Amino acid sequence: VSYIVMPWMNIPSTLKQLKVYCDYYNEVGKKCAAQGIKFGYHNHKHEFVNVEGQMAYDYMLQNTVPKYVFFQIDLYWCVRSNNNPLDYFRKYPGRFKLFHVKDENELGGSCSMGFDVIFNNAATAGLEYPVVEIERYSHPVMQEAKESADYLNAAPFVKKTYRK
């Protein structure tokens, strides 16, 4: 096991409560690091809300230790919540070891995600691997998976090293 990702949390109503989560993630990340495992957090749309006047996602990035906690940015939910992943890459460089790559249906299906620009900034983000998910199926699952894999494998902006 190389990576462990926390897939969800309910967003607390106070920063004090959110800090408890961040401290917990730091401790888990420290224990994982001692075993050679990277620990990260995966966002959804609900992290892009204000808690006591501060964006929860930013608060989490600011209150977790980069050495112990990385972020698997869900590009779809970041964009769908009217945020720009590039702003996060620039503000928190190196924190996004995994990209959760998805679109409304198969990858590239909506043409609204801007994957070319996102992947062209992957080095700033700290990307090690993209992880593909399909949000909604319009075809059989295996066909969707193949179409998404074909899209990434053919995309000139996706480094060959990610195509393992």
Task: Provide a role label for each language-model segment.
Residues 1-71, 162:
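Active-site acidic/histidine proton-transfer and metal-coordination neighborhood
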